[in-house]
From Swiss-Prot:
Annotated function: Maybe required to maintain cell division activity in meristematic cells.
Reaction catalyzed: O-phospho-L-seryl-[protein] + H2O = L-seryl-[protein] + phosphate; O-phospho-L-threonyl-[protein] + H2O = L-threonyl-[protein] + phosphate
Positions of region (Disordered): 788-814, 1012-1093, 1196-1218, 1266-1340
Traits of the deletion mutant: No visible phenotype under normal growth conditions.
Protein name per the record: Serine/threonine-protein phosphatase 7 long form homolog
Coiled-coil segments on the chain, per record: none
Stated family: Belongs to the PPP phosphatase family. PP-7 subfamily.
Binding-site positions, Mn(2+): D660, H662, H773
Keywords associated with the record: Hydrolase, Manganese, Metal-binding, Nucleus, Protein phosphatase
Gene3D superfamilies in the record: 3.60.21.10
Biased composition (Basic residues): 790-799
EC annotation from Swiss-Prot or TrEMBL: 3.1.3.16
Top-level lineage group: Eukaryota
Length: 1340
């Protein structure tokens, strides 16, 4: 490690151990350190100015004394020091309800409230109901009724109170005196305790409590005051808050009593006070002594920067832990010590809607007791979300009954401890623990302009840097061969470094007299490098394993906050030998989010260690959820600011381009060490596909995010086709995350999906090399006529349906216009799955397009998303954009081997066209195939020298071997060996992408996959698909065609022209909130252990029912009609029926739903008896049910939207009027509630004996769960007779209509079936009215 690099490190402000201050990322101190908070003070609001000239009549004063509220009046008008209040807020921690100072935790307790304000603390909680007619209540208790202009909800105008109650009449009667007293107390306590935005109004909340004066004197006004102070401190400590209110006078008095920072000196003591009409001295609380003349000679009064720096350097002797001496307590009024028995109670403090916990067990030194390491506390953060907004009439005593019960038991929860005999030692166990969990430094270490205040922390930073450099220099000398010359040079270097430090820090003390401080304050959390160099093992191409110290990489190392106990070097990264028996310590997030190189190295070591030593379910023990959350949050902030196409330019540097990784963590570790870690002269561009298939996709992605946060201008992560919900749900990443994080897996998966959407789509290196995962894209101007083109296709389809003379000829595709780099700026990339229709198609093009040997640019109709482009397009794109090379990914060798027109990928790269390189960086992929089926491919990465980019240097990689053992998170065997006669259904675009295998570099072929997605960031409504080729039945009858189903030869989708396009204005207002909402609906628990997906497909010989969402289909044509159903995770069976014998006949019927406003379409397909046997053999039952949730509205021609839908599939024996048995597929837009169903997400459960319900983001055809019903008995009369009745399959779809849309409903007095038959016979219509058409997600 270079000594010079150590001279540039900042102090770590803490906490090192984040187990206590878990909300640090939300705290104001984090924003200050990151320079996000303007250097100004908080605005302190209060409403007591209107009380200054409100005279206190002796009669009213006597009542205040009886209530125990007189002390508030006496201290309420002390001037506030805004800078001091702000500096204290920066030290307040909502997690503990204490201030974190360098000397330890300290806080305002019930003792302080009782003594300083004279408020009663031992009594019933201040709470109750607010269900009142406030005008009537004012008239009842105040004797006056406020007018409409004076009464604002539960607030009344302060001017109205002053006008009616400012002057008490002479010789008032008891009623008048009580009314005036109530008005004065109401204005005083409301102004003192509350400081909301209603500056000129007074809260009437306390008025009901003032009815009975005897009860007022018993209430615990002190605990209510402290609760409101805690709540305001917690709220103001958030990084985005700029104001504070509440009883801030109490906070300032407390600070003056206990802390030296900002504390003035009293020029003289204040004597007892008297008032005419009241015998004896008034009961002034201790806080009244600060109403004297003050001086700042001893402790200068400064601004916020000065106070902040003073707190950073505060020492233990500058804190007065026990300011209330016995002599003082003997002189103050008895009410000030009336609650001494509960000063140390651990209990909730209550004031109507506010509940905050009192934690004296964390500050026992304030009570003269020895402080030990306190037990973990839970201050119930959820309580902060409870307030009075929207609850003007609410019974708070009932809402907080549990906490009120705890307060009533306050005496039993008083803490105790051993007396503190002497000041706490610096090395006391509590202090050692505290220094690890606290935030020690608040002042940021950024550059200051000349003449600005320079915090003392800069001096300590210089000292730490010099000592660290001296340590490194000395250690390096000891490791070298020591000569006289080298020893002299080392000593000279140390002298120079010491001289520099002493020159800057002369005031810290004289070293000539030999005096040495007992311990530095504050202690810097800067850990020196470990004696043993950090090692990452690697396997070079020659086959021999070499271990290189990270410190030998030419990178300025950072110093980690908490060094790990490193395991011994391992000579084989995948070895199964026993590693260190010492458990790996969990990672902690560096304070302020400022990552260091050492921290990222620790991440690599931890991930490598856990992959060999821990089961996946224990991964969160080394990478806690809060660390992952911080990492993704910081990375997302960086990615969000990057353009769709990032540009990398440098005068002279090296760029490493990496292809698909697919969760192969250990190969990535070797790759980065082989190529050299990112630094000032080395860039990295990763071309996507970080997750899925491999067993360590999460670690791979998080490691790359760590590098991105560390070096955002040197590491660039582009998006791949597998960074989507559809792929990750199919190829294992979702299951991997849910397995590794258990109950929090759903939240982790959601965060990853949100981060995927922020990844850029492409990069341009030195203006000469274009990189993207898929490749080229079409011209954005071609999207403008999509709607007109769909209308044309729909009219042509209708003409074919009504005119049998029209030949069913396929459209001859025309070459699309090629896009340019300028078009990328118009792309909306924040989509969880790329759209396949509408005006935002470029993301799908970039992620899913493939090269072809044929010229031109065409839709990839076999896949349903992306393009195919020829060498002419490559040449044109390079020429138009002045580029030399195109580097893409998506080149899995097993899939490339299936394409005769493309070169194989076993070497890790291929030149598909002149200037077009396909790169693949996952060696020996996919890792879970059997040995005889493996391609044993090498991988590669590319090194570019910029700005020339004259040549590409291909660096081959072999797989690190052997890899640690791991199980697949997806059913790779089924995907590798699909049944030869299996044809996957293709559901509509609104169907769940979670069941979609997609990338052609995956284990099964995706060449014929039709792909559809949702744009979650824009909340766009999905158009019906028209340009994507779909395979329809060749023998659907004319009756079916009359209802809008396209003819078989057209190969176009049913389209509703008036549907909203992607990117519509209706979606523009929704982005982040809708993303989170939609994503939360798609995430669930892990799939069953079998990791298989159930697929139910009923396909006829001449009529195959298909929908439009991507499902993989075999490349080989299917010889016959299949029925394929997995039987609960066990072996599957399929039956091929002969076309001539089992042809199916379809007819349409309509259910009468006029009474409910639901239009319905029912399709009956008749089969013979064999179908029932197939279903029975496969499922073991004669009845099953599956439900799925749909999550996308469908817009029909009329413009109304369908409500979110649920699909219901069932089959059962028929009733008497139906021959034998009926299978019904139901898609009902009404919400289906079934409380008895157990939620299951993912594949078919191995045990189907219990009912279950599968919830997904969209309806899926690959149904995940069957529900056993009672097995019905067969009619024995049929026996084996050849005259068995036909089986009937009914497909019933419902579309929910608005109650006001009567024109779409079928009249109840009409025969709905007759309407259908008439419509079919007439053949005058191309399709039914939209109310009778099949919804888009159930097109047949």
């Amino acid at each position: 490690m270079e000594v010079q690099s150590l001279l540039n490190f900042d102090l770590d402000p803490g906490p090192v151990d984040q187990s206590i201050l878990v909300w640090q990322h939300e705290h104001r101190s984090a924003a200050i350190w990151e320079d996000e908070v303007p250097p100004r003070e908080l605005t302190c609001r209060h409403k007591l100015l209107g009380m200054r000239d409100w005279p206190l009549d002796p009669l009213v004063c006597q009542k205040l004394i009886e209530f125990g509220l007189y002390g508030v009046y006496k201290v309420a008008f002390i001037q506030l020091d805004y800078a001091l209040i702000t500096a204290l807020v920066e030290r307040w921690r909502p997690e503990t309800h204490t201030f974190h100072l360098p000397a330890g935790e300290i806080t305002v307790t019930l003792q302080d409230v009782n003594i300083l304000l004279g408020l009663r603390v031992d009594g019933p909680a201040v709470t109750g109901s607010t269900k009142y007619n406030w005008a009537d209540l004012c008239e009842d208790l105040l004797g006056h009724r406020p007018g409409p202009k004076d009464l604002h909800g539960s607030h009344v105008s302060l001017a109205w109170l002053r006008e009616n109650f400012r002057n008490l009449p002479a010789d008032p009667d008891e009623v008048t005196l009580k009314c005036h007293t109530r008005a004065f107390v109401l204005a005083l306590m409301s102004g003192f305790l509350y400081g909301d935005k209603s500056k000129h109004d007074v809260a009437l909340t306390f008025l009901p409590l003032l009815r009975d004066f005897d009860e007022v004197a018993k209430l615990s006004w002190g605990s209510a005051t402290l609760a409101l102070l805690y709540r305001e401190l917690c709220r103001a400590s958030k990084r985005t808050v700029s104001t504070i209110c509440g009883p801030l006078v109490l906070l300032q008095l407390w600070a003056w009593e206990r802390l030296h920072v900002g504390r003035p000196g009293r020029l003289k003591d204040v004597g007892a006070s008297y008032m005419d009409g009241i015998d004896g001295p008034l009961p002034d609380p201790l806080g009244c002594r600060w109403r004297a003349s003050l001086s700042h000679k001893e402790n200068p009064r400064g601004g916020l920067d000065f106070y902040r720096d003073q707190f950073d350097q505060q020492k233990d002797e500058q804190v007065i832990w026990q300011p209330y001496t016995p002599d003082l307590l003997a002189k103050i009024p008895l009410i000030c010590v009336s609650g001494e028995n509960i000063w140390r109670t651990v209990a909730p403090l209550i004031c109507f809607d506010v509940v905050e916990w009192h934690r004296p067990d964390r500050v026992l030194r304030q009570f003269g007791l020895h402080q030990t390491i306190p037990a973990p506390c839970d201050n119930e953060k959820a309580l902060h979300a409870i307030d009075k907004r929207g609850k003007s009439e609410y019974d708070w005593s009932a809402r907080h009954s549990r906490h009120i019960g705890l307060w009533e038991a306050r005496v039993s929860s008083v803490v105790s401890g051993e007396p503190e005999c002497s000041p706490m030692d610096y090395n006391d166990p509590y202090m050692e623990w505290y220094r690890r969990i606290t935030r020690r430094i608040i002042s940021p270490m950024n550059e200051r302009r000349p003449g600005q205040f320079l915090p003392t922390g800069f001096a300590f930073q210089v000292l730490v840097q010099r000592v660290a450099a001296i340590h490194a220099r000395s250690r390096a000398s000891l490791e070298e061969e020591l000569t006289v010359g080298s020893a002299r040079q080392t000593l000279q270097d140390i002298v120079d470094m010491c001289a520099g430090a002493l020159q800057l820090n002369a005031p810290l003390g004289s070293l000539s007299n030999g005096s040495v401080a007992q311990a530095p304050t504050p202690e810097p959390f800067l850990m020196l490098p470990q004696p043993t160099p950090t090692i990452i093992p690697q396997k070079p191409m020659g086959g021999e394993m070499v271990c290189l110290p990270l410190n030998d990489m030419e990178i300025d190392d950072g110093l980690a906050a908490e060094p790990l106990e490193l395991m011994p070097p391992v000579q084989d990264i995948g070895c199964e030998q026993s590693l260190s028996s010492v458990s790996q310590k969990p990672l902690f997030w560096p304070s302020g989010g400022k990552l260091t190189f050492s921290w990222v190295c620790e991440v690599m070591l931890v991930f490598d260690w856990s992959s060999k030593n821990l089961p996946p379910c224990e991964f969160s023990s080394v990478l806690p959820f809060n660390v992952l959350d911080e990492l993704v949050l910081f990375a997302s902030k960086i990615l969000k600011k990057e353009p769709n196409c990032v540009r990398i330019d440098s005068e002279k540097a090296e760029v490493v381009v990496v292809g698909d990784l697919h969760g192969q963590l250990h190969d990535l570790l070797y790759l980065m060490q082989d190529a050299g870690f990112p630094d000032g002269d080395r860039f990295y561009v990763f071309n996507g596909n970080y997750v899925d298939i491999g067993a360590w996709g999460l670690e791979t992605f998080l490691l790359l995010l760590s590098w991105k946060v560390l070096l955002p201008a040197r590491v660039y992560l582009l998006r791949g086709s597998h960074e989507s919900e559809s792929c990750t749900s199919m190829y294992g990443f979702k299951n991997e995350v849910l397995t590794k994080y258990g109950d929090k897996g759903a939240a982790v998966y959601k965060k990853c999906l949100e981060c995927f959407q922020l990844l850029p789509l492409a990069s341009v290196i030195a203006g000469k090399v274009y990189t993207a995962h898929g490749g080229l894209f079409r011209d954005v101007s071609s999207f403008l006529s999509d709607k007109q083109e769909r209308n044309r296709k729909r009219k042509r389809t209708q003409k074919k349906q009504t005119d049998n003379t029209v030949l069913d000829t396929e459209d001859r595709s025309e070459s699309l216009p090629l896009g340019s780099l300028k078009d990328l700026s118009k792309v909306k990339r924040r989509v969880i799955d790329p759209p396949t229709e509408g005006s935002n198609l470029i993301p799908g093009d970039i992620l899913w397009s493939d090269p072809s040997k044929d010229t031109g640019l065409f839709l990839n109709k076999e896949r349903g998303i992306g393009l195919l482009w020829g060498p002419d397009c490559t040449a044109k794109f390079l020429q138009d954009n002045n580029l030399k090379w195109i580097i893409r990914g998506k080149g899995a060798p097993d899939e490339r081997a299936k394409r005769d027109d493309l070169a194989p990928m076993n070497g890790g790269y291929a030149e598909d066209h002149e200037g077009l390189i396909t790169l693949f960086s996952a060696p020996d992929h996919p890792q879970f195939q059997d040995t005889e089926e493996r391609h044993n491919n090498k991988a590669a990465y590319i090194i570019l020298q910029i700005p020339e980019c004259e040549e590409l240097k291909f660096q081959p990689l072999e797989a690190v071997s052997p890899r640690p053992k791991a199980e697949a998170y997806y059913d790779f065997r089924r995907l590798i060996h699909p049944p030869s006669n299996l044809v996957h259904n293709i559901t509509n675009s609104v169907d769940s992408p979670s069941s979609v295998p997609d990338d052609k570099d995956n284990l099964i072929s995706s060449e014929n996959v039709e792909y559809k997605s949702m744009d979650l960031s824009e909340q766009m409504e999905v158009d019906e698909k028209d340009d994507v080729d779909s395979k329809y039945s060749e023998s659907i009858t004319d009756e079916v065609a009359a209802f809008g189903t396209p003819a078989s030869g057209d190969r176009d989708m049913v389209d509703f022209s008036d549907k909203t396009e992607n990117g519509s204005k209706e979606a523009d207002h929704s982005e982040t909130a809708e993303i989170s909402k939609d994503l939360s609906d798609t995430v669930g628990k892990p799939e069953s252990c079998s990791r298989t997906r159930g697929t139910y497909e009923a396909i006829g010989t001449d009529a195959k029912l298909k929908s439009n969402t991507p499902e993989a289909i075999n490349l080989e044509p299917q010889p016959g009609c299949d029925l394929y159903v997995p039987d609960s995770g066990n072996s599957t069976e399929s039956r091929t029926e002969k076309a001539a014998e089992e042809a199916c006949v379809g007819r349409i019927s309509i259910d009468d739903c006029s009474t409910t406003g639901d239009a319905a379409v029912e399709l009956e397909i008749t089969y013979d008896e064999k179908l029932d046997r197939v279903v029975t053999e496969i499922t073991g039952n004669d009845a099953a049910e599956c439900m799925t949730d749909g999550n996308r509205d469908i817009a029909t021609d009329g413009a109304e939207n369908l409500e979110p839908s649920t699909s219901k599939l069932n089959y059962s024996e028929p009733s008497e009027d139906i021959d034998d048995s009926t299978m019904k597929f139901r898609h009902n837009t009404s919400c289906v509630a079934d409380s008895d169903l157990e939620t299951v997400n993912g594949g078919v459960n191995a045990d189907c004996s219990s009912s279950s319900k599968c919830l997904t983001s969209k309806p899926v055809v690959a149904h995940d769960k069957f529900t056993n019903l009672t097995k019905p008995s067969h009619d024995k009369g049929y026996g084996e007779s050849a005259d068995k009745p036909e089986r009937v399959i009914k497909l019933v779809t419902y579309s929910k209509r608005k109650s006001s849309d009567k024109k779409h409903m079928i009249e109840s007095n009409e025969d709905p079936q007759q309407k259908v038959n008439d419509s079919v016979d007439s053949k005058n219509k191309g399709s039914l009215d939209k109310s009778q058409s099949v919804p888009g997600d159930m097109d047949s």
